Amino acid sequence: MKDMFLYNDAVKKMRQFFQDEKGFTEVPAQSRQSILAACEDPSTISQYIFSGVNWPLPQTGQMWLERELLDNPKVDGVFCITTSYRNEPNPVEGRHDKIFPMFEFESHGDIDDMIKLESELLEYLGFGSSFKSVKYDEASQKYGVSELDYDEEEALCKDYSTCTFLTHFPLRTHPFWNMRHAGDGIYNKVDVIIHGMETIGSAERATDVYEMREQFHNISDGEYANLLFNHFGKKRVEDELEEYFKLEMFERFGGGIGVTRMVSAMKSAGLLLDK
């Protein structure tokens, strides 16, 4: 994110929506250390040493936000602004930055509540008020592919709406281990594709500790867990995981907004102007 003025304007509007309109609480997250902060994709993590102990550079503030909400269930919601480090082996110019700002949120409710909140955010930012949605399997059948990629994301915004909600992801897309399983291998995950790029990634969270534990160890045929074990040791990873499982779970959802992509989308829609 190179333009500080565009960054400031976009973040200011998102902060106003979540804090002033929705009553969410902004929380500090970046100062915390966590192995599960590498939860987006362990194959792209980078590490650092602090006080003689290795940690992953954070890819997301999700696990910290979840903890804040679960520890403080009376708040309407929480959000944070973090820096995401993704050591992508083959970054696509215009789509992937290895280091970029993230605006993340967590709140009470199910997938429908999540879609409603995200729709209200888009309307608040100026993208209009009419958005279409399509289930993942329906879209993959339409375009004749098993998994949707960049070309399909661009097609979605041409065929449906500038802001398209891609919903209900199947198991073959390797959903994160604590996403809510709706049954029959379908997970309550929603990506919001804006101007041809996934800009908001979100999901209803799981509440079944047994199912989450099984999913953590078995997702991607165990490769996900083994990558973390190899980097940080099985005991450290499982100790942190079990500490999370001790929290009292309730219905909730959360998401992350790539600020660079949101700025690009808002510029394309004429909602942000260069200064």
Regions found by a protein language model. Give the residues of each.
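TRNA-binding/sensing appendages of the translation machinery
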Residues: 1-44
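Short aromatic/hydrophobic-glycine micro-motifs
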Residues: 22-26, 127, 145, 271
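Short amphipathic C-terminal alpha-helix that caps PH/PH-like domains
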Residues: 115-126
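Flexible helix-coil linker/hinge segments at domain or subdomain boundaries
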Residues: 125-133
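Short amphipathic alpha-helical segments
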Residues: 6-10, 110-117
